[in-house]
Amino acid sequence: MLLPMKESKRKRYCQGLFAFLVIAITLSGLLRTAFWPKDVNTYESRNANKPEAFTVGNYLSGVFQDSMEKALADQVPFAQYFKKVFNILRFQYYRFMLLPKAEQHPELCFHYKGIGLIDGYMVHKPADLSENIEIMLSLAHKRADDMRACREINPETEYYLFYIESDRDYDFETAEKKDTYGFITENMEIPADRTGRLCVDNLEDYKKIYFKTDHHWNCYGAYEGYRGLMTLLGVEEKLLEPVETASDPLWWAGSKAAEVGFREYKEPFPICRYEYPPMEIFINGSPSDMLEPQEAFFSGEMDSISYGDYYGGIEGEVILDTNRPERKNILLLGDSFDNAIRKLVASHFNKTFSVDERTYEEDRGEPFILAEYVRKNDIDIVVYDGDILAFSGDAFL
């Protein structure tokens, strides 16, 4: 009789200890969420979710409850660790069940959680222009109005559009292509000889330009984009060429892999070295030497990498000054695709201004008004560039 009693007592003790740990972790998560929320979700490389302010309006509309649920998923201790373990196990299952089929039939597109996998490349579903028609029209008309207002103050300034096609423009299963470029150029009212694009007309085009697991272009795609943009702008001097390409690149997993929880699906991160002219770089007004740390990479000082780590994150304003006043000043108005070509473009100009309208006001403390910015900085050339997200996101309005 004594043995069963001891086992029963031990069982109750273990149950009580487990319940205590669960309650302790939950309470610590609630306290952390309410009073000391962390700013960054390091596992997913994004800003951590935080709860909205508790107000009657937020509570009745459900905004507070939804934000609290998302915040707890980020703030509770060990949440990222458990998510990582879960994603690793899920990836192993995915690799065991689906990847062999994908490898046997590279011409087919296999779908998982909104992402397609074709010949080893993760691809998004092509954009449905009808779903974003109002935002795209509003943004195109706003930019057309901005250029008209700018011409009244700065009649000498030239305006260009350079569009970067992606998997959101081309359906690899049906070989159908969206005419996003035509829609944008028509509604922004930029003359045809001032517009250009980097085309994706088939899977082979896409594979040359983009990462397997990320929505950004790789260094080869960025270089082709740079060449295309310089041709559009009529730059006649010799373009920069890579002097070295990484023979032993670091491996990483990009945004698409993170989107479906497959951080273990890694690929090489190719890097090209260029001989840039001397330039001073300012990020949101502060001097910086963190864009494209070529020496650190090629000397082996970097042990991990991502698109943002190497080319820079989302910044409201980046200025690259080569101190050659006899040359023109250029303004790039785009998104994070610009990050990989800023220094290449800057090599041909006096000052290169790169503005991301999504975060400019927050980072610089004032709204972005094109006419005033062009006048203040003596801009000669304005380029609207990017993929479809730069022309369909309400954050740019």
Where on the chain are the PLM-derived regions?
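Extracellular glycan-modifying ectodomains
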Residues: 1-397
